[in-house]
């Protein structure tokens, strides 16, 4: 009623709460997100919406969704492509890690996901600084990820090639 933007957020865990294949999981995630878009539009025509879905695989040992897995970025990039085709903004997560402390794993996972989501063209990236499969937030992780975000933005800008610049 107040025209608040709605950010759809189903969470599909391939092989646990959704199809085991990434293609099947993305199809289910997009379908669930689109259902939410329809409900939002039925409730308030013209309501701003953003498409999104989590696609982390299930860590069977801990019973938690892995936010550091490559499948998370694969799924987010695929749903972003669908959203862009439909002219909808999209969201996802990056700068998060399965690691419990700031270490090589946390840096590698954060950097990979930040660059992957930047290249996929997501409009809104959240959960920066999340650690331990989203069970904690680390200020150190947030600061490090902020630096990586700056590097990724610079990388994605590229550079100009022209007679003047040569």
Segments (PLM) and residue ranges:
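C-terminal catalytic subdomain
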Residues: 90, 99-166
């Amino acid at each position: 009623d107040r025209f608040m933007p709605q950010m759809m957020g189903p969470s599909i865990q391939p092989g646990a709460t959704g199809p085991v294949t990434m293609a099947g999981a993305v199809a289910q995630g997009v379908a669930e997100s689109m259902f939410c878009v329809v409900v939002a539009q039925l409730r308030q025509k013209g309501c701003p919406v953003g498409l999104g879905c989590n696609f982390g695989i299930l860590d069977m040992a801990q019973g938690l969704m892995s936010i550091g897995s490559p499948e998370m970025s694969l799924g987010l990039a695929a749903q972003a492509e669908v959203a862009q085709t439909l002219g909808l903004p999209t969201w996802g997560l990056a700068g998060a890690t399965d690691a419990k402390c700031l270490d090589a794993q946390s840096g590698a996972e954060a950097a990979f996901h930040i660059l992957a989501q930047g290249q996929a063209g997501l409009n809104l990236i959240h959960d920066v600084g999340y650690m331990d499969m989203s069970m904690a937030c680390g200020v150190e992780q947030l600061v490090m990820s902020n630096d990586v975000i700056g590097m990724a933005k610079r990388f994605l800008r590229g550079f100009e090639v022209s007679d003047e610049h040569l």
